[in-house]
Amino acid sequence: MNNFNYFNGKMVEDILENPDEDILNPDKSKTKDIVIKEDFCGACLALPLAFAGAGTATATSGDTSGNKSKSSIFFWSVVISIIGLIATVWFLSGDCTTCVSEGNSRGKRTGSMVCSSTRR
């Protein structure tokens, strides 16, 4: 399990260890306050971005001296590749442990993620 397995603000492991708690009841009045934590990490975006940049760089890696737009595409694809690789290393080497979804607490998905890390 990762640190995103929450149900009503409690870790799923804690709920399973305490079966006396009536938190898994399908009663709709209790489930309206569920906050859905999305397990999103920047590395999910950085790796495809790095591959896309590398693919674009490979596609335009021929003779770039004759075509100005091809030179521009090649330059920006290399820049995107480098940024993607830096972002991948940044996110994979981080020590983010408590990513939570702020804002709406009615069980709807929100996109604002807050990371409380000691290094960032």
UniProtKB/Swiss-Prot annotation:
Chain segments annotated as transmembrane: 40-60, 72-92
Gene Ontology CC annotation, any one: membrane
Disulfide pairings: none
Keyword Cytoplasm: no
Signal sequence coordinates: none
UniProt keyword Transferase present: no
Protein name: Transmembrane protein 010R
Organism of derivation: Invertebrate iridescent virus 6
